[in-house]
């Protein structure tokens, strides 16, 4: 959070962030939207975990890429859950909205669990209702 932003970031909020340059990364640095995925309990830490968004929809769709069509985004964007990263809160520039749709939030959780090889369990930010969601069957 910069000096003009006093608000603590919450899970599933969409922020504009200044992403740092990362050597050997396919992710573009600079100002771009991200989805905060850190839990509320970590509010006092100097960093948050984020998933970067891209407007490039022409790349091959992966199970860890979630399409978000959200009124807070000027174009449909893909959440790159395979590029989850820690980010210093000072790099968060401005809150632009949040992931409103429960299905999109579920899809983000599922993609993160898939990428991190975690079971989709209540301890991973899922509610009991999510456990019985039709997408979780099988």
Predicted ranges, named:
Residues 25-70:
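Compact nucleic-acid interaction/catalytic patches
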Residues 7, 70-138:
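C-terminal terminal-subdomain/extension
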Residues 1-4:
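Short alpha-helix capping/helix-loop boundary micro-motifs
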């Amino acid at each position: 959070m910069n000096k003009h932003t006093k608000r603590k970031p919450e899970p599933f909020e969409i922020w504009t962030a200044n992403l740092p340059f990362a050597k050997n990364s396919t992710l573009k640095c600079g100002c771009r939207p991200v989805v905060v995925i850190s839990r509320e309990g970590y509010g006092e830490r100097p960093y948050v975990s984020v998933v970067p968004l891209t407007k490039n929809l022409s790349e091959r769709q992966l199970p860890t890429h979630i399409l978000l069509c959200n009124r807070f985004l000027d174009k449909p964007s893909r959440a790159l859950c395979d590029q989850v990263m820690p980010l210093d809160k000072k790099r968060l520039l401005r809150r632009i909205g949040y992931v409103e749709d429960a299905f999109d939030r579920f899809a983000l959780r599922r993609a993160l669990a898939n990428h991190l090889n975690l079971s989709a369990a209540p301890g991973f930010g899922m509610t009991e209702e999510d456990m019985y969601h039709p997408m979780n069957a099988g």
